[in-house]
A protein has these predicted regions:
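N-proximal helix/coil linker or "cap" segments that precede and/or mark the start of modular domains
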Residues: 20-54
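Bacterial N-terminal signal peptides
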Residues: 11-20
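Hydrophobic beta-strand anchors of alpha/beta hydrolase catalytic cores
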Residues: 74-75, 110
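Structural microenvironment flanking redox-active thiols in thiol-disulfide oxidoreductases
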Residues: 86-129, 142-144
Length: 187
């Protein structure tokens, strides 16, 4: 017969295992997506703007990153009230403009995910700090959680199969170097 103290330890261990196994935590348990990882299938709400849906090449109310026709996707996780994201916005608007005016047009696409943001908050954000590229809502942080709950801004460069080719935490300061990196990653 087991001693009561040993039974309690075993019971606590079993409870801990079940809690970890069934906590609903998905995505990266050990951190953020890294180069070489494949992103989970994220079902995202389509942007409200017809122009943004046309740019992404999507027609439905929801889509997955793999539905976007491009060779490389810049996928930026932002926060509606994130001051660093506000600082990065004009830099990425410049990057978007350079991509769209050059030979990379159509080959590289850009998309932002507003972690915790709903459609009304995105409209507020766009009134404060215009973005040249689409922003999609993630009001319940579902996609954000699947991505390991990164601090914002968090930028990923992803191929059409969802393979992560590069990640960057924080503001991308050197747009020229980042554009070169992106150009080098496009087959």
């Amino acid at each position: 017969m087991m001693k009561p103290a040993r039974q309690i330890v075993i019971l606590i261990a079993i409870i801990a295992l079940f809690t970890a196994a069934f906590s609903g935590k998905t995505g990266w348990c050990g951190g953020l997506p890294q180069k070489g990882d494949t992103l989970p299938s994220l079902e995202l709400e389509a942007p409200s703007s017809d122009k943004d849906r046309a740019y992404l090449g999507i027609t439905g109310q929801t889509f997955r990153l793999g539905d976007i026709r491009c060779r490389l996707l810049l996928f930026e996780v932002i926060g509606i009230y994130c001051p660093q994201c506000y600082r990065q916005a004009p830099l990425f608007n410049t990057l978007f403009s350079r991509i769209e005016k050059g030979k990379l047009q159509g080959r590289i696409k850009m998309l932002a995910l507003a972690a915790g943001g709903n459609v009304a908050e995105i409209q507020y954000l766009l009134a404060q700090r215009p973005y040249s590229f689409p922003i999609v809502p993630d009001p319940a942080f579902e996609a954000h959680k699947l991505l390991g709950e990164p601090r914002t801004p968090f930028t990923l460069l992803v191929d059409p199969q969802g393979k992560v080719l590069h990640t960057h935490k924080g503001v991308v300061e050197d747009i020229d170097a980042f554009l070169k990196l992106m150009t080098d990653l496009v087959p």
